[in-house]
C-alpha cells in the first residue's frame, strides 16, 4: 500500500513523496515481505521523503472511534488513521520522518501532541492512554530499519528531471475520492487529482509531460457514499465475484455498477487527461448486455 509498484522492476528507483502519510509499521512489513519474495529493496532503489508525515497509533484509534460513534452515518473509512494524520499535518502538529533523527526533539513534539490525544482517547473513546516512552522507543526501532531509505526526495527528483531522466508519477485512489472534487464527505483526506503530483513531490508542474488516467470498464466503490449507477441485483454480485472486487486494505466487498460517463468526464476535465487506459474490459464478457450512464446536460 505504501511502496510504489515500480519496485518490482529491476533497474528502477521508487520514490515515496512528501505528500504521502506513512505508517512506519506497515512500510517495514512491506519491505520485509518483498525481500522474503526475493525482491531487492534497499536505499538505492527505494527512497522515502524525510518530509512525509507518520501515521501513529493514536491516529488509528481516533479513526476507528469516530466511525463507531457515527454508527449508520459512518463514512466507511479503512481505519488506518489516514484522516487524523492529515489533520495533524494541517494543524502543524504532525510528526515527520525528519523528526526521528533527533530523539529529544521527537520526544518534545510527542509530549505536546499526546497531551491532547490522550485526553481524546480516554474521555471521548474510552481508550487507554498511550505511553510516550513506549511510542518513542517503537519509533526509534522503526527509524533504525528505515534510515537508509529516508532522504530529501524533492532534491533527488528535481535533479533527475534536470538530467533528462523519465519519471512516472503514480497516484492512488480515484478522482471521485478527492477531498475537494469528490463526493464529499465520502472522500479520502487528501487530493487525488493529477496536479497533486507536483505538491506531493516538489517537482514543478510545468516539468510534467502527459497525464494518463486509468479507469475500469465498470464502476466500483468501497464503503458508503453516492453511487448512481450501482447494480443492486444478482448481476452486480456476480460482477464483484468475477472481477475479484474486494478492498485491498480491508477485504471489504466493493459495490459494483455500470460505467458512469458523467463522473468520467468530470475526472478528465479536472485532471486534464491526455489519454485513458481502460482496464477490466474482459470482465464484462460475462454479461449479455452492458449499460453506461451518459451525460444528458446541454453543456455536455
Question: What are the functions of these language-model segments?
Answer:
Residues 261-270:
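Short active-site loop/helix that positions an aromatic residue
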Residues 274-288:
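Internal helical hairpin/lid segments
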Residues 146-193, 201:
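Acidic catalytic cores of enzymes that act on phosphate-bearing nucleotides/polynucleotides
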Amino acid at each position: 500500500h505504501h511502496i510504489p509498484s515500480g519496485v518490482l522492476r529491476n533497474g528502477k528507483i521508487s520514490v515515496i513523496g512528501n505528500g504521502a502519510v506513512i505508517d512506519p509499521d506497515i512500510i517495514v512489513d512491506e519491505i520485509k515481505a518483498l525481500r522474503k519474495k526475493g525482491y531487492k529493496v534497499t536505499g538505492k532503489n527505494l527512497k522515502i521523503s524525510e518530509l512525509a508525515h507518520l501515521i501513529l497509533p493514536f491516529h488509528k484509534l481516533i479513526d476507528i472511534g469516530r466511525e463507531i460513534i457515527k454508527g449508520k452515518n459512518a463514512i466507511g473509512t479503512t481505519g488506518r488513521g489516514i484522516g487524523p494524520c492529515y489533520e495533524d499535518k494541517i494543524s502543524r502538529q504532525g510528526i515527520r520522518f525528519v523528526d526521528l533523527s533527533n530523539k529529544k526533539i521527537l520526544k518534545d513534539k510527542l509530549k505536546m501532541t499526546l497531551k491532547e490525544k490522550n485526553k481524546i482517547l480516554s474521555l471521548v473513546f474510552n481508550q487507554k492512554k498511550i505511553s510516550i516512552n513506549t511510542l518513542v522507543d517503537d519509533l526509534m526501532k522503526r527509524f533504525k530499519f528505515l534510515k537508509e531509505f529516508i532522504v530529501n526526495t524533492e532534491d533527488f527528483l528535481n535533479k533527475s528531471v534536470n538530467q533528462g531522466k523519465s519519471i512516472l508519477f503514480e497516484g492512488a485512489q480515484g478522482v471521485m475520492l478527492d477531498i475537494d472534487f469528490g463526493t464529499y464527505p465520502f472522500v479520502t483526506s487528501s487530493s487525488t487529482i493529477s496536479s497533486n503530483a507536483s505538491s506531493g513531490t516538489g517537482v514543478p508542474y510545468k516539468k510534467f509531460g502527459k497525464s494518463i488516467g486509468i479507469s475500469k470498464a465498470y464502476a466500483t466503490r468501497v464503503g458508503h457514499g453516492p453511487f448512481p449507477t450501482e447494480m443492486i441485483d444478482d448481476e452486480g454480485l456476480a460482477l464483484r465475484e468475477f472481477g475479484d472486487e474486494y478492498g485491498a486494505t480491508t477485504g471489504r466487498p466493493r459495490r459494483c455498477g455500470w460505467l458512469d460517463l458523467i463522473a468520467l468526464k468530470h475526472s478528465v476535465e479536472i485532471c486534464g487527461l491526455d489519454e485513458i487506459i481502460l482496464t477490466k474490459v474482459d470482465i464484462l464478457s460475462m454479461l449479455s448486455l452492458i449499460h453506461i450512464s451518459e451525460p444528458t446536460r446541454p453543456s455536455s
